[in-house]
Amino acid sequence: MAQQTPLYEQHTLCGARMVDFHGWMMPLHYGSQLDEHHAVRTDAGMFDVSHMTIVDLHGSRTREFLRYLLANDVAKLTKTGKALYSGMLNASGGVIDDLIVYYFTEDFFRLVVNSATREKDLAWITQHAEPYAIDITVRDDLSLIAVQGPNAQEKAATLFTEEQRNAVEGMKPFFGVQAGDLFIATTGYTGEAGYEIAMPNEKAADFWRALVEAGVKPCGLGARDTLRLEAGMNLYGQEMDEGISPLAANMGWTIAWEPTDRDFIGREALEMQREKGHEQLVGLVMTEKGVLRNELPVRFTDAQGNQQEGIITSGTFSPTLGYSIALARVPAGIGETAIVQIRNREMPVKVTKPVFVRNGKAVA
């Protein structure tokens, strides 16, 4: 039986088409995925992301533990509320999960991890935390709503108390603050400004209804996927998994190689991959008719004249751009063009950086 978030009833009242998403009943859309997508790019939309797992870590050695657990280095986190994006890797350098870590005090950090990987994440964290005497608290008492879009922060702020408005005023991206009963973070998965707001489960339904009244459009998983793909953001299980290195998933920037004496899980394997060479994640654009889909082959000829083949990890029609885009994992050495086999047709595609839209504007 699929689980329900505390907002399940609100979704049905808003006319959602519900689907089973990794064991959770979640809204796919509320009538028009396209309208929801455009609302986030031009105004404000919101997503129920309560299926994600919030994990609080307490203990005097928490920073030391996270410097070993994560490929990125929490030594960078010195300001209260600052957040960091990182991969959590296995010994062979594969990605167990990608997550966000927040720093509050030396003995209090918070992780937000994916729903599909919840059980293995918690088992892995618990296993490696034991020598550090870390107290692990899974915050199933909290719901999480993402409010995204150019007008999202302004509309969300109409629900805040004066204390909460003061707390978030001037807050830069990738920070979080606990203000009253809300945890408000300037993070998201759309390429737009906004907040991800955690609150007690019993407050979630009222907060959702108030956002609707403030003119924030409910959005489902469908729009969430097209928005994150336009923004060039990875989806666990597609761009990366336990068999795929962050180096092959455009996550090289999340690996903190310095200081060289910091040992983290997967470091040795990554250093070998970096030396030998590895696949890369690129963007693809196809302006001709048709849609680039997951798992289609991508072929190109490298500089040595060798035929090479990669694979599309995520592909869709981009509502913002009006043509098809994709992320693809390919051997190193790809040029500016490639060929994608769509049914029995060989379609030319342009190779770009793996990001297409930022703050509503085309970048590809």
UniProtKB/Swiss-Prot annotation:
GO cellular component: cytosol; glycine cleavage complex
Catalytic activity: N(6)-[(R)-S(8)-aminomethyldihydrolipoyl]-L-lysyl-[protein] + (6S)-5,6,7,8-tetrahydrofolate = N(6)-[(R)-dihydrolipoyl]-L-lysyl-[protein] + (6R)-5,10-methylene-5,6,7,8-tetrahydrofolate + NH4(+)
Gene Ontology biological-process annotations: glycine decarboxylation via glycine cleavage system
Superkingdom, taxonomy of origin: Bacteria
Pfam family, one: GCV_T_C
Keyword Nucleus appears in the UniProt entry: no
One function term, GO molecular function aspect: aminomethyltransferase activity
EC number: 2.1.2.10
Keywords attached to this entry: Aminotransferase, Transferase
Similarity comment: Belongs to the GcvT family.
Physiological role: The glycine cleavage system catalyzes the degradation of glycine.
Listed PANTHER family: AMINOMETHYLTRANSFERASE, AMINOMETHYLTRANSFERASE, MITOCHONDRIAL
Subunit structure: The glycine cleavage system is composed of four proteins: P, T, L and H.
Protein name, entry field: Aminomethyltransferase
